[in-house]
């Protein structure tokens, strides 16, 4: 089954690579329109998925990732339209020039070909990835989690209907509709057909893909994100940033999971933090110093060492008091996932040092980690947030779904 999907996807990719920007945008507009027109069927499938997931005992954080609402689905359709407005990188000349030999050389952006994406309980990924792949002339094979099986199938049917209406092969966007996990291992060996693989899920999935895949893999999306409250931080805006980074949508990978507090500000800062977190319903996991300083009003539990590596994805926040900037940077290096980290400070020398020494895909000064998102970065919907350094880093927009080829123009030109 998968080999036939690969053959069809590869054939579709050759056709997609030849489309103009206008033709690709018309397809995306049609997909957005169909998502809204077929909203009832998608939401109905999603309700079944959510009910099944709840019966299976999934956490509230996972249920939030899984659930669609009319507003969320409308936002997904709007994201597709936003991709239409983005500049098409395919065909762009990156650089080049006339060589001494007389050969005119240019390096031009081209599609990757076929992209494979393995993801878990995030139904929005189906549309986000499909729209970005189509905009860049790539075909895509999707393998969603069993928790979103019905939602993904309904969504892909809508996308394929739009493709067919625009005269394009339905195989441009395909989903593996069998939830059998053994098919993941088979997909990982489809290097004959898939040019790049992107896993979006937990650490176990990423480890499996890195160890078993014969396809180039881009990993990321696991966010043990930190905020360091420096000794010079302005407390009022710092609290506002922390509340946003923790509570706006706790189930996302750019949510802060560990708060590092400079010891010189701890006694002043921790009590007001506790009050604010109590109002926001956040449970604090405090180290020894925090446990000594705080006695409410926020719910407070002792921090377990293993929790420093946790991606809670819930209203839980580690709070650790550090001696200085060295302690904060050292902690992030040991426990961070190179996703998103921030410093809250009024000392621009410390800000510059933090930015230079924290090796993460996104580093912020006096801002929330929640900005690490393709839409927020002006990239449109994202295919993933890469925490590695090759071939993409941070939110992966359109350019991350392209490669390049060298093209030489001559006039009977030969090498001397």
From Swiss-Prot:
Gene3D superfamilies in the cross-refs: Aldehyde Dehydrogenase, Chain A, domain 1, Aldehyde Dehydrogenase, Chain A, domain 2
Catalysed reaction equations from the record: L-glutamate 5-semialdehyde + phosphate + NADP(+) = L-glutamyl 5-phosphate + NADPH + H(+)
Domain of life: Bacteria
Family recorded in the similarity comment: Belongs to the gamma-glutamyl phosphate reductase family.
InterPro entries: Ald_DH/histidinol_DH, Ald_DH_C, Ald_DH_N, Aldehyde_DH_dom, G-glutamylP_reductase_CS, Glu-5-SA_DH, GPR_dom
Name of the protein described by the UniProt record: Gamma-glutamyl phosphate reductase
GO molecular function terms listed in the Swiss-Prot or TrEMBL record: glutamate-5-semialdehyde dehydrogenase activity; NADP binding
Coiled coil, from the record: none
The protein's annotated pathway: Amino-acid biosynthesis; L-proline biosynthesis; L-glutamate 5-semialdehyde from L-glutamate: step 2/2
């Amino acid at each position: 089954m998968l080999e036939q999907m690969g053959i069809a996807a590869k054939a579709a990719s050759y056709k997609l690579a030849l489309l103009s920007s206008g033709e690709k945008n018309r397809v995306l507009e049609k997909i957005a329109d169909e998502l809204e027109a077929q909203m009832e069927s998608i939401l109905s499938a999603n309700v079944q998925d959510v009910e099944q997931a709840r019966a299976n005992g999934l956490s509230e954080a996972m249920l939030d990732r899984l659930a669609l609402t009319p507003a969320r689905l409308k936002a997904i359709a709007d994201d597709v339209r936003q991709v239409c407005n983005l500049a098409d990188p395919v065909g762009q000349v990156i650089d080049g020039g006339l060589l001494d030999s007389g050969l005119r050389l240019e390096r031009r952006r081209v599609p990757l070909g076929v992209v494979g994406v393995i993801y878990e309980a995030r139904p929005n990924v189906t549309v986000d990835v499909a729209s970005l792949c189509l905009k860049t002339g790539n075909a895509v094979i999707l393998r969603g989690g069993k928790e979103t099986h019905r939602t993904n199938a309904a969504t892909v049917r809508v996308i394929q209907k739009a493709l067919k209406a625009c005269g394009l092969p339905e195989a441009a966007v395909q989903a593996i509709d069998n939830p059998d996990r053994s098919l993941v291992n088979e997909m990982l060996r489809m290097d004959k057909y898939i040019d790049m693989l992107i896993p979006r899920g937990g650490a176990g999935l990423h480890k499996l893909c890195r160890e078993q895949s014969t396809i180039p893999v881009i990993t990321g999306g696991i966010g043990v994100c930190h905020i360091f409250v420096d000794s010079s931080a302005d407390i009022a805006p710092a609290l506002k940033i922390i509340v946003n980074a923790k509570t706006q949508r706790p189930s996302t990978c750019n949510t802060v999971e560990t708060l590092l507090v400079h010891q010189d500000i701890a006694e002043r800062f921790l009590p007001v933090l506790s009050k604010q977190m109590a109002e926001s319903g956040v449970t604090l996991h405090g180290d020894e110093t925090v446990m000594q300083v705080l006695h409410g009003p926020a719910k407070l539990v002792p921090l377990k060492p293993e929790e420093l590596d946790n991606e809670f994805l819930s209203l839980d926040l580690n709070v650790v008091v550090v001696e200085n900037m060295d302690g904060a940077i050292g902690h992030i290096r040991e426990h961070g996932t190179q996703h998103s980290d921030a410093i809250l400070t009024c000392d621009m020398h410390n800000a510059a040092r933090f930015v230079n020494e924290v090796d993460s895909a996104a580093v912020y000064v006096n801002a929330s980690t929640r900005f690490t998102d393709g839409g927020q970065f002006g990239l449109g919907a994202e295919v993933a947030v890469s925490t590695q350094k090759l071939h993409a880093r941070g939110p992966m927009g359109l350019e991350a779904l392209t490669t390049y080829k060298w093209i030489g123009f001559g006039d009977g030109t030969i090498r001397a």
